[in-house]
């Protein structure tokens, strides 16, 4: 069977898996590590071609995280929000997503994905948003996420919040700090880390359509 579930589990499937795995394999020609140097070849291939879509998604995410990327950032890059024609998204976030879109194509489902590094636990829907994922937060600090309501019997008087995941939106819990991190707050923080807009305007060229 698959040796995965090191960083993710998911409900659904990754329909773009062939393109995702092929492009990751193509990138290996230009990959290098200043720390591992020649030993870096032992890391390759990034993706186990014999694995399932779950295993391949896990391979890619683990590779980014083990390379030094923060887990939520790696998830945002691999499973982005629908941003290109989003009229309510801030320009900073659009610039962020456009910047990373040149480096990583979306891993599209339909899939609901749960991820963790032991301290952070999160969930995200792919940008198509076709897998149901609902969650409750209770007054005694439980968070219950499932594909349907009624999976567990919960006293309705204890529920302080009920909501559902939306396409590309992230539910993230910091178990060390004991708090839920707001999606907008998290992503604006990442979007503020670099002047992505400047990089995009400097490196991207829009060709005329006529």
Residue positions per predicted region:
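A short, polar/charged loop-to-alpha-helix boundary motif
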Residues: 23-37
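Short, small-residue-biased leader/transition segments that mark boundaries at the very start
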Residues: 3-4, 206-209
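Conserved mixed alpha/beta core segments that line enzyme active sites in large multi-domain catalysts
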Residues: 1-23, 63, 68, 72-174, ...
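A detector of low-complexity, intrinsically disordered, Ser/Thr/Gly/Pro/Ala-rich segments
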Residues: 16, 204-207
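Short, glycine/acidic-enriched loop or turn micro-motifs at the edges of active sites
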Residues: 14, 177, 209
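Intein/HINT protein-splicing elements and their conserved insertion hotspots or analogous self-processing inserts
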Residues: 37, 41-82, 159-205
